[in-house]
């Protein structure tokens, strides 16, 4: 959707609020929200009018209330930088079965490492049986969870996440959860690059996933301070109160 649609909508409402993450089209709106970490207000200089309020960055990320509520408990847990639980979640239907590829990549980890794996799949996941087969061949305990309703709790209880560099990145940051991110769609690239540049996450190249993932995991075990640093930097990106911030801005229109 772009300006051509918004002009028509404006005839039937007082204010128009737009959520964008691409900055590649013009808008006719009173307020624009872009939650991307590396985005700047100037990216929209030629795309919105001068009177449009621009809310830019993950401090405005729209997270469910359980994430900011669980943030204090989660951050206290990060004082113990040992990896006991790895959380894997690609989101959506994972049509390309990246989850199975991640599990395959873990084969190159030191088999003597002591941790458990929790795999979260969406209700529309297409490759559950494949994931189960790969999971059963690993030397670690693997739990496969489908269509969960307690994602904040699962993140809080985990020590490292492996997942897509989409909107879930802000949930992980809110809880200070260190992450290895994968770019599964072009609009995730900016997020992944921003988090990696900040030191809040590591990006694993999807093309070399099976080759490189194990060495990354091994590195976290040999350098626990790296986890603490990543957690601290991730937690500084968003407090999870974006809903209130955005609501306040809308009420001021």
Where are the model-predicted features located?
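Short hydrophobic beta-strand element within catalytic cores of glycosyltransferases
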Residues: 161-163, 178-187
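A short, well-ordered alpha-helix in the C-terminal region of glycosyltransferases
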Residues: 219, 226-240
């Amino acid at each position: 959707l772009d300006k051509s649609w918004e002009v028509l909508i404006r005839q039937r409402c007082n204010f128009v609020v737009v959520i964008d993450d691409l900055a590649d089209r013009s808008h006719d709106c009173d307020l624009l929200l872009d939650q991307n970490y590396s985005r700047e207000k100037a990216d929209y200089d030629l795309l919105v009018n001068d009177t449009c309020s621009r809310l830019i960055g993950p401090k405005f990320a729209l997270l469910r209330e359980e994430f900011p509520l669980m943030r204090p408990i989660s951050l206290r847990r990060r004082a113990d930088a040992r990896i006991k639980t790895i959380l894997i979640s690609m989101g959506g239907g994972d049509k390309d079965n990246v989850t199975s590829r991640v599990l395959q990549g873990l084969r190159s980890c030191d088999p003597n490492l002591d941790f458990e794996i929790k795999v979260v799949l969406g209700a529309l996941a297409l490759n559950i049986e494949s994931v189960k087969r790969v999971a059963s061949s690993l030397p670690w305990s693997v739990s496969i969870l489908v269509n969960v309703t307690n994602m904040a709790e699962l993140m809080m209880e985990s020590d490292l996440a492996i997942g897509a560099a989409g909107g879930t990145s802000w949930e992980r940051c809110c809880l200070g959860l260190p992450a290895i991110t994968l770019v599964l769609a072009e609009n995730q690239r900016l997020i992944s690059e921003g988090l990696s540049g900040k030191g809040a996450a590591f990006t694993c190249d999807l093309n070399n996933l099976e080759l490189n993932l194990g060495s990354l995991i091994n590195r976290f075990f040999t350098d626990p301070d790296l986890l603490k640093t990543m957690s601290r930097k991730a937690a500084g990106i968003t407090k999870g109160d974006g809903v209130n911030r955005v609501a306040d801005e809308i009420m001021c229109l």
